[in-house]
Amino acid sequence: MVLSVPVIALGATLGTATSILALCGVTCLCRHMHPKKGLLPRDREPDPEKARPGVLQAAQQFNVKKSTEPVQPRPLLKFPDIYGPRPAVTAPEVINYADYTLGTTEESAAPASPQAQSDSRLKRQVTEELFILPQNGVVEDVCVMETWNPEKAASWNQAPKLHFRLDYDQKKAELFVTSLEAVTSDHEGGCDCYIQGSVAVKTGSVEAQTALKKRQLHTTWEEGLTLPLGEEELPTATLTLTLRTCDRFSRHSVIGELRLGLNGASVPLGTAQWGELKTTAKEPSAGTGEVLLSISYLPAANRLLVVLIKAKNLHSNQSKELLGKDVSVKVTLKHQAQKLKKKQTKRAKHKINPVWNEMIMFELPDDLLQASSVELEVLGQGEEGPSCELGRCSLGLHASGSERSHWEEMLKNPRRQIAMWHQLHL
């Protein structure tokens, strides 16, 4: 037992020494077999023969040669062809057209070098599609006009025309106006157009109109007009066909009208024909501006909504004194001649075209709507002093023109906002 401790210590020492020697031997053997494995990649010398292809190293070696010689363009470089319109007028400034040739007064020069010939070919290809400047170096203004269109030019100056056909049904006692077509000039205003027909007799008049169609130079309607007319009234009746336009603000205007006697002598029945519309001269407006507003009625809530949007071209005798001051609109609800309620919009700075965008609401029973009306007054007022009336208008069945038609459209289309322009008067 006493000798076992030294023996164990000696064995452990010998084992440790043997392990260290074995590790050193293995390390030396590895260094001998791979002498460059321990070096960094940048310290290794590339071996072209043993190099293997990889992602960052190609399998083939390329040699790049640097040269300081200038790169010259190819002598046969072609420019893209430029196509232009054929000139409407013969002019010496325009060349390279099949029917026009340009003579040269200079004699041909001596043959040049190949490089000069290449440059001349390039210059010739470019200048064939360009303009020749005058010799004095001054470039005159060239007026470019679009292609002349005879049909468009004729339609600009011609009067509007209407195509129609008249037929009469004796059993139904009705007059039919079919094959409706309209030809108008390009400068007529309005986005949409329609035809309104009316027959006037001794006892009164009846009227009908077509649907709105997108206004074009040549507009065609697939539908016709049906007007009730007794056979005994046919010889004395007068038919009026009116071509009207309607813009995006629901403003209606007349392009022209055609009046025909139905006695059978001037207008044969059953024959299609063209008629020239007579345009009425526009009288100068005596108003003081226009106002744009929309109205609608809510039957479930018994409410009348009036939206004051804006006005334009406001002027009066006192307009110079009211510049820079406030402008408002007073809205009055009336039933027949009795005033029910009145409200006023906010004030806007007095300009030629003021904008409000304000809604005014009135409570009005449905049974009173037919006999009611709305009166508008545009007022201008300064910081001190009384207000001045700039214009007024009244909407209702008692009115005429656009003021009456606006109220009728509101009655026909409940719960729908309908906007129109109205002329102001003093």
From Swiss-Prot:
Domain C2, first and last residues per copy = 158-275, 287-422
**Which parts of the sequence lie on the Cytoplasmic side of the lipid bilayer?**
30-426
The record's tissue-specificity note reads: Expressed in brain, spleen, kidney and testis.
Any one Pfam family here would be C2
One GO term (biological process): regulation of calcium ion-dependent exocytosis
Alphabetized GO MF terms = calcium ion sensor activity; calcium-dependent phospholipid binding; SNARE binding
| Highest taxon listed in the record's lineage | Eukaryota
- One cellular component term from this protein's GO annotations in UniProt: synaptic vesicle membrane
Q: PANTHER family, from UniProt? A: SYNAPTOTAGMIN, SYNAPTOTAGMIN-13
Protein role: May be involved in transport vesicle docking to the plasma membrane.
According to its record, what is known about the domains? The first C2 domain/C2A does not mediate Ca(2+)-dependent phospholipid binding. The second C2 domain/C2B domain binds phospholipids regardless of whether calcium is present.
Family per similarity comment = Belongs to the synaptotagmin family.
Q: What is this protein called?
A: Synaptotagmin-13
What does the organism's lineage look like at the top? Eukaryota, Metazoa, Chordata, Craniata, Vertebrata
